[in-house]
Amino acid sequence: MANKNYRFETLQLHVGQEQADPATDSRAVPIYQTTSYVFHSFDHAEARFGLADPGNIYGRLTNSTQGVFEDRIAALEGGTAGLAVASGAAAVEYAVRNITQSGDHIVAAKNVYGGTFNLLRHTLPRDGITTTFVSAENPQEFEDAIQENTKLVYFETFGNPNADLPDFEAITAIAHKHHLPVIVDNTFATPYLFRPLEHGADVVVESATKFIGGHGTTLGGVIVEGGNFNWAEVPGKFPTLTEPDPSYHGLNFYEALGGSAFVTRIRAILLRDTGATLSPFSAFLLLQGTETLSLRVERHVENALKVIDYLKTVPEVESISHPSIEGRKDNELYKKYFPNGGGSIFTFDIKGGKDAARVFIDNLHLFSLLANVADAKSLVIHPASTTHSQETLEELEDQGIHQGTIRLSIGTENIEDILDDLKGGFAALRESGLAK
């Protein structure tokens, strides 16, 4: 695929297996269901374990089905290297831990997925890694929060759950001025709608469970490296990448591997030691989803914008959180960064608070009440009592999550059926008299 600049829709079908499988002539990517691999000789085995010869060593680290998936997502994101792991949460933690240690500091947007918020707020501090949370709407807050021991800046393409947008280029410029890498979670946008590496990000993480898999069947995560960040620019700033690693006989990952050092170290060290490995079958299922990613995302976005137009007409709706709405702070950013639209996962606030939300949700029949998002099926949830329930009321309010906040993940069903289901929920709410 390197000899021609194929477009996204072609890349999502072909990268990683441009020709039939050499062992079987299978056109589909085979499921290499194995734990280990035969080395050709004593020297071959030694070279593999020493990272002198890239290739399969053991199933915890690499697998050929997984390798195709990694290459494909890296190509779609425009990166130099990719690593697939067992979940999106594992991808986030590995990416962060790869360049942090006790005594280090992170600057992160406060409007992130609840699991990521808990990782940064509660789990990492136990290991001596602290985070300052700032508003993604205000790039200056990122700069004001940077300390001498800050190691990275972290935010999401679309905030979770309110679909609010950061100013990517402004924030990444600030981070790079201070010699800091930017890690962006691109789960809610996907590389089809937005490629963070083209707007200043250095590392992209995604929950492949969501749009990439697309059908609510498979957990997975992916980390993609941009390959342009100079980890050695500030001596001693990123010792895990620029200083000798004793577990690899003094290997300096950045010197040896350059633009793939970040991802390779995660595979060689973190995945080796903690083993959040993606199974070959999961990699196969995620590849099936990847092949139709653009088609599904177009339909998700088309349906979502029609749902938003409908919600604007409903008197029981207090507010809608979506960057496509004129007058919002991030509407100009939406027009700039998302010319083809985006944001099929968003929230609205319903009059009547939690009790009204309960009636509305319990009277939906097409929408499934569950914690996942970006399924082909339409989904609904009440964040304050579920996905973000471990946060304090103050933290929830600070993130724009209220007792009347409802998150929708708009699927690919017929739009009239989606709207009919929502109308049924609002009809039940009116009958209850709770929407006051």
What are these regions (language model features)?
Residues 152, 181, 203, 319, ...:
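Structural preference for beta-strand elements that scaffold enzyme active sites
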Residues 2-3, 16-20, 83-313:
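Conserved PLP-enzyme active-site core in the AAT-like
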Residues 2-63, 71-72:
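N-terminal "arm"/small-domain region of PLP-dependent enzymes with the aminotransferase-like
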Residues 274-277, 281-283, 288-292, 297-299, ...:
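Conserved small-domain helix->loop->beta segment predominantly found in fold-type I
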Residues 121, 148, 296, 362, ...:
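PLP-dependent enzyme catalytic core of the Aspartate aminotransferase-like
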Residues 41-93, 115-123:
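Conserved N-terminal alpha-helix of the aminotransferase class I/II PLP-enzyme fold
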Residues 224, 347-349, 409-411:
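Short hydrophobic/aromatic beta-strand micro-patches
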